[in-house]
Amino acid sequence: MTARPSVSVYSASEDKVVGTCSLPAVFTAPIRHDVVQFVHTNMAKNSRQPYAVNRLSGMKHSTESWGTGRAVARIPRIHGGGTSMSGAGAFGNMCRGGRMFAPTKIFRRWHRKINLHQKRFAVVSALAASSLPALVMSRGHKIENVAEVPLVVEDGVRAYEKTKEAMTFLKTVGAIDDVNRVNDSRQIRAGRGKMRNRRYVARRGPMLVMPDNKGTRAFRNIFGLDLANVNSLNLLHLAPGGHVGRFIIWTKSAFEKLDKIFGTFTEPSTVKSGFMLPAPMLTSTDVTRIMQSEEVRRVLKPKKLQPKRPSRYRQPTNGIRNRRLRLRLNPFQKKEKAMAKGMQNKKNREARHAAKVVRLAKARKNVAKALKKK
């Protein structure tokens, strides 16, 4: 969350700061991606147009089932003879020329109701996310040449009447890179939508927010730049696709109206009845520091020192039954057991016997030599 007390106001014609304004409290609100995604999904459903197939599609045949006993399916079959269609299955979704399975109806539940407070919370979260450069860049916006986020400009941009002046303004504040990104991303849509007046798709660029609907004439024909009124901010524009972090350019007068529209953490909004900014549950996420602070330790009771209980483990005393005690009393027993195990192996026994025979032969030979010398 943003923690700056003030934001710089930039000139519309020159690359310089012309003033400052306090940061609205809405930019320090908690960011809830799950709430934004949920509200966006349900809001997007409210602009759908009902559609359905013809009620009689696939049912315009004179048919009758042949019944059982003919070793064929019991699907209704077309009457008549003398044509390739006679006797062909009809009506079913598995048949040629038949209806679809579960034909679509126009009385489907197309629209969704959303809690008013939930919609306001989602808008607040989207605005708070737009003040973090990391989230704005992760959404794909080109803001490397932008001086500051959130970007606030003077109200002189509302006096522009020519698109040429608007393009010069975008170059001055460094937002032209994001507009060019939108132009470069324009391509033909994949699928049937290209035949239904939705031929092209493109990314979303910056959004210019103004205090009212005046002064939009110079900007409305720039492809890649969206315009919005601060009094009617829409979540579908603040977080396209349900992804927070839209690059927003604010005019100074629109930026200063945010505290009145959304209120603060202590004062309710003067526009939205009964709405106050949702306060974060934790101002510090360092739980260890909180638990070790003097304020918390002063309230908690001192730690009780429990007497040390004797261990339930009893030292073994029977060396015959306990192997560990037996090895501790007689360490040679482990080697002795390994030697006994080696004696049980037939190959080892034969090898030792052969070695013993060789040793005895050498000993007899040495004894014979000693007797000859005498």
From Swiss-Prot:
<protein>
    <recommendedName>
        <fullName>Large ribosomal subunit protein uL4</fullName>
    </recommendedName>
</protein>
<dbReference type="InterPro" id="IPR045240">
    <property type="entry name" value="Ribosomal_uL4_euk/arch"/>
</dbReference>
<dbReference type="Pfam" id="PF00573">
    <property type="entry name" value="Ribosomal_L4"/>
</dbReference>
<dbReference type="Pfam" id="PF14374">
    <property type="entry name" value="Ribos_L4_asso_C"/>
</dbReference>
<dbReference type="GO" id="GO:0003735">
    <property type="term" value="F:structural constituent of ribosome"/>
</dbReference>
<comment type="similarity">
    <text>Belongs to the universal ribosomal protein uL4 family.</text>
</comment>
<dbReference type="GO" id="GO:0006412">
    <property type="term" value="P:translation"/>
</dbReference>
<dbReference type="InterPro" id="IPR013000">
    <property type="entry name" value="Ribosomal_uL4_euk/arc_CS"/>
</dbReference>
<dbReference type="InterPro" id="IPR002136">
    <property type="entry name" value="Ribosomal_uL4"/>
</dbReference>
<dbReference type="GO" id="GO:1990904">
    <property type="term" value="C:ribonucleoprotein complex"/>
</dbReference>
<keyword id="KW-0689">Ribosomal protein</keyword>
<dbReference type="GO" id="GO:0005840">
    <property type="term" value="C:ribosome"/>
</dbReference>
<feature type="region of interest" description="Disordered">
    <location>
        <begin position="336"/>
        <end position="355"/>
    </location>
</feature>
<dbReference type="InterPro" id="IPR023574">
    <property type="entry name" value="Ribosomal_uL4_dom_sf"/>
</dbReference>
<dbReference type="InterPro" id="IPR025755">
    <property type="entry name" value="Ribos_uL4_C_dom"/>
</dbReference>
<keyword id="KW-0687">Ribonucleoprotein</keyword>
